[in-house]
A protein has these predicted regions:
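Hydrophobic positions on the alpha1 helix immediately C-terminal to the Walker A/P-loop
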Residues: 90, 94
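Inter-lobe coupling linker of SF2 helicases/translocases
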Residues: 151-152, 156-175, 190-207, 217, ...
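P-loop NTPase motor cores of the ASCE clade
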Residues: 350, 364, 654, 658, ...
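Conserved RecA-like P-loop NTPase helicase motor core
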Residues: 159, 473-587
Length: 990
């Protein structure tokens, strides 16, 4: 890279290379200015990451990201914004900052069904590479010789269950940052029996972590304790001392004390706080009811009765509950879906008879039709401490063989009935639902687009054929896990041809196919039929109609479905169509729960944090519903079971916990709103200056090799001639556009146009090269008269000349910080303030060979000015570090006090028990009872004596631990200082 730059210098010289009114010195200066590291308490710290990302600026997200960097001694943060406020974006900004600082061992632990969404968001919004690790890919890397697939230069994404299984690998990896999504799953980590939570916590001890959760507190204050220990074991004392202080009826003082101690760890923003920045659209629900035909009802009853049998040879005991749930989903989806699965069950039983004792894969049962089987299996067991082992295949007895044959006959009967049913009642109602939905969209002024969700590939194929035949020919597109049908293949081929030679093509066939189908849906099709698994991670804000053709029982999955369209950036209200079998009492009650209790389908925000938090990942809720379908046969039993479930849900949504969460975590006063406003204004100013500097520098550097359009900040970079060192440049030709942060929502890049950003390889090449070049001392003319700058001090310098010198000071203590030191002096000996020198460097400049010498007197004056600035800055840095140290000291003091208080309470409890036993002894008249109680008292007194002896030792141990921690912090406190000379030139202002 450097050779290429040097070759350019030799070919054209500075006068030709550095044009567009920026001198060589200015170019080098701005390269350092754009890439400097800022301190954690600076609003400008995230400027480069924000410019690099394709996200709209919202103040609460910037505030949350800055909170995570608030102290260099912090071990992480809990970001607990309400649902819908973009915690993923907040984490993305933080990850971008780590990536930019070349701290790239990054891990995301998320629910299995959110992994693809994370990967897509990182790529689309932040240009960050990632890899999803699960069993197959992990084993593939191992086979290829990678001994630890977690150790890589990509962001690793995995599920909770996988993280638990591979804990030894996690522990070996030196993570720079770990992001844990839906972190409330770990809130019971304080319970030793909670193996998943404790395994993950122990594997990631001492790593910096960001926890994302909308519900950090649901059932008990102890959950907050659990989450804080994942971040920092020294935020509070041990569990005993925490219970003693906070696990009781708290008064206002207790709440304020706990709030103060949580404040450095937890950040929460409410939706009502950001309404002036974030526009929310509503959800409008349409319920499409239907009644099954006599044949459909007969099939449902027969299969349902079959699933309720005590023993089934077709389903393994270890996974029977999950597989029964899936079969019920397919049964409710369509006769086509259940027909294919019945065929698979028959084949499995026939194979069982032929190959007794041979283990069979149950995944093959659903391999084609139910794509989500693998991730649902993983999620199903995520909350279980020991995943069920697969059943071992045993030899069948003669009686078993006869029973298997009878089961096959029953399944064949069901299959025959399913085959006879050609028309599905629900499918007939689909057209009525679409007509209503499209009419509603027309009224809203929204585009005529519908996203239909089904859980079955066979139902997807059936609906595609049906819609194509009845009014939507050529207007339907499929979206599933393989996307290998003829239509999708043709769409992909045309898309590749259209975008040939552009950055739109990533090289990943899977990702490019998904992009091609989304583009086709946006530009050509009216309807997309998507399966559950495939639709993870795609954003379809251009569509405002969601059709739940099959209704999941898990509210979290429904929320994710609707969230594909009802999300930030949606311009219209979103219509949600649901189908309900009115003949099925259980279906009716499930819909009532989802609609009325969870409020998923209407309103502005969808499901509330309280309700979603009460069900966690939704799997337990789903299991309860599956259990009702399995065990309840009469309408009365169904009603009683659902009434009990609803009552349990109400108990989980505790008013007491809502009050605690409001008091401890929420802050809604005018000062918060004012801070958000001022931070947003300052961030916009920082970004504007950053973008203008990057544009001017790029314009100057590539002046001879590109055509620039200043109106829209775009340029076309021409192919460089293939000439040795310059051949490296050939990677970059094409059209670029730098979209300013304030116009990202309204600006759409044309095909083939690359977004120009600080992290683009072209920009990185330019910056690295400029920082590497030695710039000779020269004569620089700065043109104030023709610049838009209006600075009285500089105006006074017009016609004068002098010297300007810039050095970079790098301080590395608790964190790394780069400061540009400016020394400026006129030829008359007047010192120019450093901030004025900064302004001078932003004036248009031209350069000539040096015609005056730098005298020793002037050189000394410049050096003295630099030294004075250095002293001032190092003192300020030390003061800031001292504040960080004091905060850490206070935290450790509190921790030590907590632990000691817990130990002292044990002694007090023993004193109280001894007193109670003595009172009992006095009251009893029986000698044998007196003897028994006296022996008990003696044992208690012995324990008390031991406790007293141990107490002082334990308190000393706590103090030693505190001293050890402080020594570690103190070692970090020492400033490592490096100073780099950048530029020196003689200036003249005209």
């Amino acid at each position: 890279m450097l050779k290429a730059l040097v070759s350019l210098q030799m070919l054209f010289g500075y006068s030709r290379l550095f044009i567009m009114k920026l001198t060589a010195a200015q170019q080098k200066y701005f390269a350092y200015w754009l890439t400097r590291s800022l301190p954690s308490d600076s609003l400008g710290k995230l400027t480069a990451s924000l410019q690099d990302a394709q996200v709209d600026l919202t103040p609460h997200q910037i505030d949350a990201a800055l909170f995570a960097f608030k102290s260099p001694l912090s071990k992480g943060a809990i970001l607990a914004d309400e649902v819908g406020l973009g915690k993923t974006i907040e984490a993305g900004i933080i990850l971008s900052q780590f990536w930019a600082e070349h701290r790239r061992h990054l891990l995301i632990i998320a629910p299995a069904n959110l992994r693809k969404q994370w990967a897509a968001e990182l790529q689309e919004k932040f240009f960050l590479p990632s890899r999803i690790l699960e069993s197959k890919t992990f084993n593939h890397y191992i086979e290829d010789g990678n001994l630890n697939p977690f150790n890589c230069e990509e962001i690793v994404i995995c599920s909770y269950q996988f993280a638990k299984t591979k804990a030894p690998y996690l522990k070996q990896t030196n993570w720079d940052l770990v992001v844990i999504d839906e972190a409330h799953r770990l809130r019971n980590v304080y319970k030793p029996a909670n193996k998943i939570s404790n395994t993950i916590k122990n594997a990631l001890a001492d790593r910096k972590k960001i926890l994302l959760t909308a519900t950090p507190l649901q059932n008990s204050i102890l959950e907050l304790y659990g989450l804080t220990t994942i971040i920092d074991d020294y935020a509070f004392g041990d569990l005993k001392s925490f219970k003693m202080q906070y696990n009781r009826n708290l008064d206002e003082t207790d709440y304020q004390n706990l709030r103060r101690r949580l404040a450095p760890l937890c950040k929460r923003t409410l939706r009502r706080q950001v309404l002036e920045y974030v526009r929310y659209t509503k959800r409008i629900a349409i319920l499409q009811e239907f009644f099954p035909t006599k044949q459909e009802q007969e099939l449902y009853d027969l299969v349902s009765e079959y699933l309720q049998r005590p023993r089934l040879y077709a389903l393994p005991n270890s996974q029977r509950q999950l597989m029964t749930l899936i079969l019920r989903k397919l049964l409710a989806s369509s006769t086509h879906a259940i027909y294919g699965t019945l065929c698979a069950l028959i084949e499995k039983l026939e194979a069982k008879l032929k190959c007794q004792g041979v283990e069979q894969s149950d995944e093959d049962l659903f391999k084609y039709d139910y794509e989500d089987y693998e991730s649902e299996t993983e999620e199903w067991f995520d909350d279980e401490e020991d995943e069920n082992e697969p059943d071992e295949e045993e030899m069948l007895s003669p009686e078993d063989i006869e029973r298997v044959k009878a089961e096959i006959k029953d399944l064949e009967k069901f299959r025959e009935l399913a085959f006879k049913i050609k028309r599905n009642s629900k499918a007939e109602q689909l057209f009525e639902g679409l007509n209503q939905g499209f009419a509603q969209l027309e009224e809203l002024g929204a585009p005529k687009k519908a996203l239909i969700f089904t859980e079955s590939r066979r139902t997807q194929d059936f609906l595609f054929d049906l819609l194509e035949k009845r009014g939507y020919k050529g207007k339907v597109v499929l979206f599933n896990g393989s996307n290998s049908d003829k239509q999708s293949t043709a769409i992909y081929k045309a898309w590749k041809e259209k975008h040939k030679g552009t950055s739109k093509i990533t090289g990943s066939a899977t990702a490019d196919k998904r992009a091609a189908l989304v583009d086709y849906f946006r530009d050509e099709a009216t309807i997309m039929i998507a399966t559950e698994a495939a639709a993870e991670g795609i954003n379809l804000q251009f569509c405002s109609l969601v059709v739940n053709y099959d209704m999941p029982w898990n509210p979290q999955r429904i929320e994710q479905r609707i969230g594909r369209c009802h999300r930030y950036g949606q311009n219209f209200d979103v219509v949600v169509i649901n189908f309900l079998n009115k003949a099925n009492a259980a279906d009716v009650r499930v819909y009532e729960l989802l609609d009325q209790k969870f409020q998923l389908f209407s309103g502005v925000f969808g499901a509330s944090d309280e309700v979603l938090g009460a069900i966690g990942n939704g799997v337990d809720f789903e299991k309860r519903i599956a259990q009702i379908y399995q065990l309840c046969r009469s309408p009365k039993e169904i009603k009683e079971a659902f009434d009990a479930l609803q009552e349990e849900l109400q108990e989980q949504i505790s008013d007491k916990m809502l009050k605690a969460r409001t008091t401890l975590l929420e802050n809604f006063d005018e000062s918060v709103k004012q801070k958000l406003r001022s931070n947003l204004a300052e961030t916009r100013d920082n970004l504007n200056q950053f973008e203008q500097t990057l544009w001017q520098l790029t314009r100057s550097f590539f002046a001879d090799f590109a055509d620039f359009n200043d109106n829209n900040h775009s340029f076309i970079l021409h192919p460089f001639f293939d000439n040795g060192a310059l051949s490296w440049f050939r990677r970059f030709p094409g059209e670029y556009m730098m979209v300013s942060s304030e116009h990202r929502r309204t600006t759409k890049l044309n095909d083939g146009v690359r977004p120009y950003r600080i992290g683009d390889p072209l920009a990185q090449f330019m910056l690295t090269g400029l920082k590497s070049v030695s710039v000779p001392v020269s004569e620089v003319t700065l043109d104030y008269s023709n610049s838009p700058l209006n600075v009285a001090f500089i105006k006074r310098l017009v016609g004068q000349s002098g010297w300007l010198k810039v050095e970079q000071l790098t301080i590395d203590s608790f964190e790394k910080e780069d400061i540009l030191l400016h020394a400026c002096i006129t030829d008359k000996g007047e010192t120019v303030p450093s901030d004025i020198a900064e302004y001078m460097l932003r004036l248009p400049g031209s350069e000539d060979p040096l015609n005056v010498e730098l005298s020793e007197t002037v050189a000394t004056a410049l050096a003295d000015a630099i030294t004075a600035q250095r002293a001032e800055i190092t003192a300020a840095n030390a003061e800031r570090n001292n504040n960080f140290f004091e905060e850490e000291m206070e935290k450790l003091d509190n921790w030590a006090d907590d632990v000691k208080a817990g130990l002292e309470k044990e002694l007090r409890d023993l004193d109280a028990e001894i007193k109670l036993r003595k009172s009992e002894s006095k009251k009893t008249s029986r000698l044998d009872e007196k003897v028994r109680v006296q022996r008990l008292i003696k044992d208690l007194e012995k324990r008390r004596s031991e406790k007293r002896l141990n107490l002082y030792q334990a308190q000393d141990d706590v103090d030693s631990k505190k001293e050890e921690l402080l020594s570690k912090v103190e070692a970090m406190l020492a400033q490592k200082i490096e100073q780099t000379k950048l530029i020196t030139f003689h200036w003249r202002i005209i």
